Amino acid sequence: MTKEWECRREQIIELSKINGMTIRELQARMSKMYKFDASIRSYKRVLARWGIRVHRQRFVSPRTEEAAARTASGDVSKALDELVTQLFHARQSDKDSLAQIEANFGLKLSKRALHYRRKRLALKRPPPDSHDSPNNSIPLMANSCLLSADNSSSSTTSNPNVAPPISTLPDPVATISSSSSSHLDMGAIHPPHHSSLPPHMGVDPSTMADAHNAHSSLTPPQSGYSSMPSLPYLQQPFQIPSQRFSRQQQSHPFPAAQHAVNGQPQALYPFIYQSRNVPMGSTMFASSNQSAAHPDGNNALPMDNTHANISYMQSSQSMPVNSYSYDRYTPNQPSYLESKPGNHQPSYTSEQPMYSTASVPQQISNGPTAVNGLPMNSYTPHSNHLHSPSPNSNSGPTDSLSAPNSTSSPSMAHANGASFASQYPSLNKSIFPASYSSSAEDGQNMQAPAHAYMQSSIYGVNQEQKSEYPSNLSMQSSMSIKDPSQLQRIHLYPQHSQYDPNGMTMRDHYSERIEPEAKPSDETLTVRSSRDLSVHNVGTLPVLSAAAATQAAMPHTMGPSAHDSASAPSPHMQSQQALPYQYYNPLPAMADPAQNVPQQLPPPIHSHLSDDQHIQYSYPNTFVNRFPQNIHHPSANLLDASAALNPVQNPLLMPQQNHEHSPLVRSDAALHDHGPLLPVYPDVDSRFV
């Protein structure tokens, strides 16, 4: 007996030097690695005789090995961490990983210990998603390539006692051939940085399958086990493509070559910039072509016919047809089959557009030939990025300029519907909500004016329609431009031009219109003075008398006595008049028709109201007046109901700047005396803290 112990002495001493080693673990290791079996009691006895102190067990628990692994430090723990990491990146199942660890270290870990260790190493896998189930084969395919023959055979032969577990990985070749038969694009598999992939991963799946048939490069090693990928793998761990968003294809960064012909990016943007139904060949950038050709925007000359099909030929050559089209088709749309990833022959030739009549922008219309009058509501949501040539304009873009009086009166089309609704009139009603269907007849071809960038959906009204902005809010009926001199006055870039009286800048297209300020005219001053007088006799309301404002000055009122019958004042008006004048904000009244405020842009909200209601809006009543940010809100006096809310919910009370302006709440002196004795919560009204 003692002889045996003496043989094993230096092995035991070596193991016992490892930092967190406990007696039970020592016993387990010796029996695994050297097939040396002895009871724990005998270990204690012998170690005591040799004068070797080994840690007592730190955790009295059924999972001692787990505890040991947790506390193991030094060489064991480093090696263990490395192995766990490798197993993780090779996507081994838990069962296999545990078997590997047991084989290499003699540590019989529990699953829980393994997970704990992974957590410590910050190895996290995104939680399995129900959506991703079809993709689960992909990383496995990549892995079986990683576990190449030389790695695994070397690591298997290096320690003969190891019995590596039988792998759960499927046969890589089956996976590959099945994926290539389904036209699975490798673009979806490999991560954006190709550097981290083994050299044969970048190849097309079909060639991979062929290569395998020629000489089996991908088969797992002859021993039948797939074991760990060796260490170089740890330096640059495998990048699995993010599975979480597998539904939406990955957007590849633009290749530089595709960047421009005529300044027009050929690659399609990912989903956000893409309107829903534009087929794959079409590019969304109708305007940039023209602005590159004529940067100053003044000489809009027709281009020669060679450019007519340019967006076609490029998009069919520069983008591989079998790559995914990024816009989302659903299978019930007729255009679906044509751009399906597997379809290698494009269904159209390069000189014939994909859809016959109206679907795709071929060339830019130079100069708007006509704009059909559309009522605002059907126009606003999507004015058009696209423009589709009329059926007869295949000969060349010059038709539209040379024959401005031609019979077709094209109308604006919305970006969503145009391409495909005009082609399939029967679907027009069903797929798009009513407000989006084109207001012209279905067969009519759609055409947009030249500076199509002004009509993207965020800029509400495009330049030229904003120029005619009649007070009844519908567009002028089909203004058409006959002489080229008029063309030069429509500027490509927004700036002050004769067309917009206010000289609006870009931001005004999508923010609310700001009324031009006007110096208060005589009428409004009369109103103010009469209001001052009316403080004494509380009941009366100041109204514009017929003398103060004649019929000509007040085009909106129905007659001098209109205020009593037609426009009954709101209940708030009473209390508003009763207060002394200092509580009103001296805002200028609404712009007066009598002055030279340009007529084209009437204030859209107030245009139907009579003048004394304008007064009511421009002088909000006292309650609202405490909250200065609301004074401009046209319905300010309707918001009084919110005073009943508790102040934290109350949008009017919240911001703290209010109280500096409002004498009703606190005098300024009171504010500055105390200083911030109480903590200041920005989102809570300070009176209630």
UniProtKB/Swiss-Prot annotation:
User: What does the UniProt entry say about where the protein is found?
Assistant: Cytoplasm
Q: Which GO terms describe its biological process?
A: silent mating-type cassette heterochromatin formation
In which domain of life is the source organism classified? Eukaryota
Q: Which UniProt keywords apply?
A: Cytoplasm
- Chain intervals for the UniProt region annotation (Disordered): 121-206, 286-305, 322-414, 552-611
Coarse class of the protein's main subcellular location = cytoplasm
Q: Where is the composition biased (Low complexity)?
A: 133-158, 381-411, 560-572
Which residue windows does the record flag with biased composition (Polar residues)?
Answer: 322-380
Question: Can you quote a single GO CC term?
Answer: cytoplasm
A Pfam family matched by this chain, by name?
Clr5
Cytoplasm listed as a keyword: yes
Quote the InterPro entries the UniProt record gives.
Answer: Clr5_dom
Its name, as the record gives it, is: Uncharacterized protein C29B12.08
